[in-house]
């Protein structure tokens, strides 16, 4: 029978890989209502606590009054409004680049940049643990596609030696399921030495890394010559929605001409851009948010290590607890939820087989007391997994 979807779904259920959407019935924040239950959440990417900030909300409301609620058309027709342009200028300033280009989603930004820059006769090389949108962009581009070993400049160099045509090296800045940082200085040196361009998706670094929140490129003290193509998202640390590509004048003009996900879609609501302008202002001005977040990360890592939990090498708000077995990861997530804590279990195919984990994410909106509540609950629940295996 064609399209036997029931069999595919049953197979996924049997492997403990079936996914369901929790229903959020409250604004984003540490304390949420999900499926009718009040919970303390550690699974949002609202890293700076701006998604429900009153000034950001007020900016959106004022933007709707001034500009309406719809983009109305694509950017190249009559959908590129003054707030969109102002956001692009603010993002160029934040990232220290000549220009930036606004996209509706991070997925579209990644697909648009890759497919506009490389095609048949070219080469795209990607880290094995890159986000799905980057991998999809590489496959859709029509270029020769290969993956190098995770965060391994030597592995990249060996593949660059076999590359043909224009060559684009693509990596996450912060790897979303592990929380570790790409070795950008080494990757940039390898790429530049072989005439390749380096593209970095800094979805999880923008706003949280760098003294000014400029992200992983600022964190490492690199520039546009080291990382010609920089991607960032606005739905995480910025607390709103959308994404951007930042780079040279020529890069942005090329994307306007050739990036199909940019050309053939309606622009985001101008009021959303007004909200993003305010969140970018808060990101720059309220440096205490990054400082407080860094303190929470230290607190969690020290406490988790004392409990004997297996963490990954992450200096970021993403703090995965590796469990291994998918069923056990789901069980620990359920045990925590019974105690009023929401921590999501991440399973294959999102992560490699045998590496299921609880993906703890911290926010500047959390308090030290809330992080301690999580550690106390883990101290109570984690040993129950070991007892079940005994």
Curated annotation (Swiss-Prot):
<feature type="binding site">
    <location>
        <position position="131"/>
    </location>
    <ligand>
        <name>substrate</name>
    </ligand>
</feature>
<dbReference type="InterPro" id="IPR050087">
    <property type="entry name" value="AON_synthase_class-II"/>
</dbReference>
<comment type="function">
    <text>Catalyzes the decarboxylative condensation of pimeloyl-[acyl-carrier protein] and L-alanine to produce 8-amino-7-oxononanoate (AON), [acyl-carrier protein], and carbon dioxide.</text>
</comment>
<dbReference type="GO" id="GO:0030170">
    <property type="term" value="F:pyridoxal phosphate binding"/>
</dbReference>
<dbReference type="Pfam" id="PF00155">
    <property type="entry name" value="Aminotran_1_2"/>
</dbReference>
<dbReference type="GO" id="GO:0008710">
    <property type="term" value="F:8-amino-7-oxononanoate synthase activity"/>
</dbReference>
<keyword id="KW-0093">Biotin biosynthesis</keyword>
<protein>
    <recommendedName>
        <fullName>8-amino-7-oxononanoate synthase</fullName>
        <ecNumber>2.3.1.47</ecNumber>
    </recommendedName>
</protein>
<feature type="binding site">
    <location>
        <position position="176"/>
    </location>
    <ligand>
        <name>pyridoxal 5'-phosphate</name>
    </ligand>
</feature>
<feature type="binding site">
    <location>
        <position position="350"/>
    </location>
    <ligand>
        <name>substrate</name>
    </ligand>
</feature>
<keyword id="KW-0808">Transferase</keyword>
<feature type="binding site">
    <location>
        <begin position="106"/>
        <end position="107"/>
    </location>
    <ligand>
        <name>pyridoxal 5'-phosphate</name>
    </ligand>
</feature>
<comment type="subunit">
    <text>Homodimer.</text>
</comment>
<keyword id="KW-0663">Pyridoxal phosphate</keyword>
<dbReference type="InterPro" id="IPR022834">
    <property type="entry name" value="AONS_Proteobacteria"/>
</dbReference>
<feature type="binding site">
    <location>
        <position position="204"/>
    </location>
    <ligand>
        <name>pyridoxal 5'-phosphate</name>
    </ligand>
</feature>
<comment type="pathway">
    <text>Cofactor biosynthesis; biotin biosynthesis.</text>
</comment>
<feature type="modified residue" description="N6-(pyridoxal phosphate)lysine">
    <location>
        <position position="236"/>
    </location>
</feature>
<dbReference type="InterPro" id="IPR004839">
    <property type="entry name" value="Aminotransferase_I/II_large"/>
</dbReference>
<feature type="binding site">
    <location>
        <position position="233"/>
    </location>
    <ligand>
        <name>pyridoxal 5'-phosphate</name>
    </ligand>
</feature>
<feature type="binding site">
    <location>
        <position position="19"/>
    </location>
    <ligand>
        <name>substrate</name>
    </ligand>
</feature>
<dbReference type="InterPro" id="IPR015422">
    <property type="entry name" value="PyrdxlP-dep_Trfase_small"/>
</dbReference>
<dbReference type="InterPro" id="IPR004723">
    <property type="entry name" value="AONS_Archaea/Proteobacteria"/>
</dbReference>
<dbReference type="InterPro" id="IPR015424">
    <property type="entry name" value="PyrdxlP-dep_Trfase"/>
</dbReference>
<comment type="similarity">
    <text>Belongs to the class-II pyridoxal-phosphate-dependent aminotransferase family. BioF subfamily.</text>
</comment>
<dbReference type="GO" id="GO:0009102">
    <property type="term" value="P:biotin biosynthetic process"/>
</dbReference>
<dbReference type="InterPro" id="IPR015421">
    <property type="entry name" value="PyrdxlP-dep_Trfase_major"/>
</dbReference>
């Amino acid at each position: 029978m064609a399209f036997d979807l029931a069999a595919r779904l049953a197979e996924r259920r049997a492997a403990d890989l079936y996914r369901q959407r929790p229903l959020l019935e409250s604004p984003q924040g540490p304390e949420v209502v999900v499926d009718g239950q009040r919970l303390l959440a550690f699974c949002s990417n609202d890293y700076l606590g701006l998604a429900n900030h009153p000034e950001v909300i007020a900016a959106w409301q004022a933007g709707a009054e001034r500009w309406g609620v719809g983009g109305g058309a694509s950017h190249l027709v009559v959908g590129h409004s003054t707030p969109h342009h102002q956001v692009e200028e603010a993002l160029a300033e934040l990232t220290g680049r000549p220009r930036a280009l606004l996209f509706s989603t991070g997925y579209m930004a990644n697909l648009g940049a890759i497919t506009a820059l490389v095609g048949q006769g070219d080469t795209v090389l990607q880290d094995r643990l890159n986000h799905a949108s980057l991998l999809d962009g590489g496959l859709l581009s029509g270029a020769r596609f290969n993956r190098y070993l995770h965060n391994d400049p030597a592995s990249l160099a060996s593949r660059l030696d076999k590359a043909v045509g224009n060559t684009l090296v693509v990596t996450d800045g912060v790897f979303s399921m592990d929380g570790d940082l790409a070795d950008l200085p080494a990757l940039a040196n390898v790429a530049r030495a072989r005439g390749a361009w380096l593209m970095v998706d800094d979805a999880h670094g923008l706003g949280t890394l760098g003294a000014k929140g400029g992200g992983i490129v600022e964190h490492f003290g690199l520039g546009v010559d080291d990382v010609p193509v920089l991607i960032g998202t606005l739905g995480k640390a910025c607390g709103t929605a959308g994404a951007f590509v930042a780079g040279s004048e020529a890069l942005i003009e090329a994307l306007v001409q050739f990036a199909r996900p940019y050309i053939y879609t309606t622009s985001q609501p101008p009021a959303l851009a007004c909200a993003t302008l305010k969140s970018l202002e808060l990101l720059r001005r309220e440096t205490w948010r990054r400082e407080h977040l860094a303190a929470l990360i230290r607190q969690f890592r020290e406490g988790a290590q004392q409990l004997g939990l297996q963490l990954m090498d992450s200096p970021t708000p993403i703090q995965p607890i590796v469990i291994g077995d998918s069923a056990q990861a789901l069980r620990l997530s359920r045990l925590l939820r019974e105690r009023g804590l929401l921590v999501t279990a991440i399973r294959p195919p999102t992560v490699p087989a045998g590496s299921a984990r609880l993906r703890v994410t911290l926010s500047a909106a959390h308090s030290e007391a809330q992080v301690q509540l999580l550690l106390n609950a883990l101290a109570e629940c984690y040993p129950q997994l070991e007892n079940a295996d005994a």
